[in-house]
């Protein structure tokens, strides 16, 4: 990548922030979600794909562009699938390969769920009376939801998980990228501006005095 050698005195946090921005730009410009789960017979596409960096150098993300989104549907890939640079013959020494594999092993805690399974489990944990409505009003938001193919893949997998054929899966996605990226914040700001919601607010003093039980009194 690049280093802050051209900006002496810059705080490391500033460099990290822009590095994350660069990763986000690469993710949003290159990543694609496979429409179906990969198999040995039909693996993920790893054809060459270059992204131009701020210093005009080219970064080959042929492997990452399809594997990164796939982790949302198959978290075990973080444990089992090393990028080419950390595979034997990829340019890294044995110590780097072992360190990379060990780090990946620790990235996925036990019980880490795939996105479709997480949605389905969340709905199952709700009252039976509202499950049908929840299956029909699944909202996707955030930057990762903009990955091409993700909404379609999620919809297809949820159709396999829905408990009754009479329940219809419907995914709702804000139309513009900015609306989808900040949908959670926009929704929260609208909710906070409602007079009826302000009656449910709790001050720190109330919480310190009554504890968590005060929440149930205000939001029965």
Regions picked out by a protein language model, each given a short descriptive name:
Residues 1-220:
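C-terminal region/appendage detector
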């Amino acid at each position: 990548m690049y280093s802050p050698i051209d900006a002496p005195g810059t705080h490391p946090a500033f460099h990290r922030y822009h590095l994350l921005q660069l990763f986000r730009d690469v993710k949003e410009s290159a990543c694609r979600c496979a429409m179906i789960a990969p198999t040995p017979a039909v693996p993920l596409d790893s054809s060459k794909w270059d992204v131009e960096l701020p210093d005009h150098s080219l970064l080959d993300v042929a492997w990452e562009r399809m594997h990164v989104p796939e982790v949302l549907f198959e978290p075990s890939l973080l444990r089992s699938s090393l990028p080419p640079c950390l595979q034997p013959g990829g340019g890294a020494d044995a110590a780097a390969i072992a360190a990379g594999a060990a780090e990946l092993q620790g990235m996925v805690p036990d019980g880490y769920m795939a996105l479709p399974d997480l949605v389905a489990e969340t709905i199952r944990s709700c009252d039976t009376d509202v499950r049908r409505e929840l299956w029909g009003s699944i909202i996707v938001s955030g930057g990762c939801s903009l990955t091409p193919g993700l909404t379609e893949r999620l919809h297809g997998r949820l159709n396999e998980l829905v408990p009754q054929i009479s329940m219809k899966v419907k995914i709702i996605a804000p139309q513009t990228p900015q609306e989808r990226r900040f949908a959670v914040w926009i929704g929260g700001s609208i909710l906070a501006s409602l007079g009826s919601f302000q009656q449910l607010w709790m001050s720190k003093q109330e919480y310190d005095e009554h504890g968590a039980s005060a929440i149930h009194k205000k939001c029965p």
